[in-house]
């Protein structure tokens, strides 16, 4: 086979969080999406609130203990885990507001609809369920020799916007986010199957000029077949490699909803 080039768009799916203070910290990512509540429903709404929290309760899944941490420490830890410190200060501030909003909404949800497994906490440090949040020790491990400068930069950004959260009709929003779009954001209905009034497509043309907006990977025919063999053992490979991957349905925002690989529909 001759060489063949495929372009893939990666859609992030979940938040990632460190499991404990002693665990190896995860790699901070540039993308993350829906909070845990939306894994089961996008219609649940927390009760209203009078004031923002001063402290959150976090369940350590390793020790089983519920630990209290200040909102400031939580938001700093969340930004450390969710966004590289090399990003511009305004981006770090935006991430801080999103992280704070997520935590505030989750706190209110637990007040009105407690999750038994959380033992009274607002969330846990389970990386598969809740927003990422480094402890200071984990941030030190992750940033290494760059810790002091990185931590100071993130802390300064957090302090500037700590009083703020994003609300819709007086309730903290579902603060879903990703690193970038393909020039237009996607609707919640397309992603989750349920409408969210404020999560609708909007133009985001600046994304198309962002670093790492487009990445390519090259494979030979044999390499591509081997890569998808386990997932699609019954795939049929046409002699014309241009027919191996066919894009089917797309959303109005341009998100690929269905693709055919080796004659097999994937969605």
Predicted region positions:
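Conserved, single-site charged/polar hotspot
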Residues: 1-267
